[in-house]
Structures are given as structure tokens and as C-alpha cells.
Amino acid sequence: MTDKDGNKQQKGGILALLRRPSTRYSLGGILIVGIVAGIVFWGGFNTALEATNTETFCISCHEMGDNVYPEYKETIHYANRTGVRATCPDCHVPRDWTHKMVRKVEASKELWGKIVGTIDTAEKFEAKRLTLARREWARMRASDSRECRNCHSLESMSSDMQKQRARKQHEMAREDNLTCIACHKGIAHHLPEGMTEEDED
């Protein structure tokens, strides 16, 4: 079918155009454009991913900057004799790509909380602290404290260099197959009020 100027009318619009081979562009040209577009997309995606994986990004929200960041700065993970600092993503974002993507999707819930103001005041944050802590402890238990083990390893620890109490606790942890978070809650942030015996395990 042609219009009054003799041009063919497209049936089905954009879907039809996508289904039929192009008479104007070569397959090679389309392929090159697709590859370049893919590289640009992947580069942009990876840049955004890394930008959201920094301590600066984490504390850019006043909820984190005003509540947990000041208490983290008082811990051994912030300042210590070796000069090695564990930042927010070191503990809260997995390093391997698959688990990192899962965590980023989970973080969208936190972004929603920011938008609706779930913890936008110190009082609201404290009211939710136990819930937030329990969620993070459960995540760490489920992953066998994977992020802790990026820096710490029971197998690499020299027990004869540890204090007697620490040596005994780590030996028990090995025997009972415990994960780091079972004993080290509150290592980087204040423990929430209202914890139960169940939370202590």
C-alpha cells in the first residue's frame, strides 16, 4: 500500500521494523553500533556501581553520616595500629560480582526508606536500629561472615599471638563452626537497645 506521494506505508510500526532485515544498514554496521552501545552501557553501569560502593557515597545521606558514621569512627576498624581501615562497603557489600548485585538490589529497599523518611531523624533511626541490626546480622550469618573473611581468617590466625581469652573463643568457634558475627556484634556500631538472648547468639 502506498500513500499519495508514492511512499510505502509501514505496517505494524516499530515492531515490524525490528522483525524485518534492514535494507539501509549492513549487518556489520548494526553489529558495530550494538557493540559500541554495549561498551558504553557497561562502562556507565560499572562506573555508577563503583561510585555507589564508596564510604563517601554511604555517608552522603545524613541518616548514615549523623548516626552510624560517628560511632564507627571510634572503632578499631576506623583507626588502628596497622593503618588498615575497613570502610562501609568492605563490611556491607560483597566483593564478588554476583553477590554484589544481589546486595545492590537489596539496597534499593534502603533507598526507598531514604525517600519516604523511614529513619530521617535520630529518634526514628534509634527506633529502627534493632530491626536494621538484626537484618544485617542475618545477612552476615547466611554468608558465613563473608565480608569479615575478606580480611580475617581463622585459618590464618596465629593463636599463640592472641590473648588467652581470644585464643579460647576462636578455638570454640572452630569447634562449633561459628561465624564471626556470632561473637563480634557491635564491633563497628553501637549495639541496639532491646536485644534478646537470641540476638546474643
Swiss-Prot record:
GO biological process: anaerobic respiration; denitrification pathway
Membrane topology according to the record: Single-pass membrane protein
Keywords for this protein: Cell membrane, Electron transport, Heme, Iron, Membrane, Metal-binding, Transmembrane, Transmembrane helix, Transport
Entry PTM: Binds 4 heme groups per subunit.
Localization: Cell membrane
Binding site for heme 1: C58, C61, M64, E110
SUPFAM superfamilies, per database record: Multiheme cytochromes
Residues the UniProt record annotates as site (Interaction with NrfA): E175
Residues binding heme 4, per UniProt: C180, C183, H184
Protein known as: Denitrification system component NirT
Transmembrane region(s): 25-45
Cytoplasmic side of membrane: 1-24
Organism placement in taxonomy: Bacteria, Pseudomonadati, Pseudomonadota, Gammaproteobacteria, Pseudomonadales
Record keyword Mitochondrion present: no
Organism: Stutzerimonas stutzeri
Residues annotated as binding heme 2: C88, C91, H92, H189
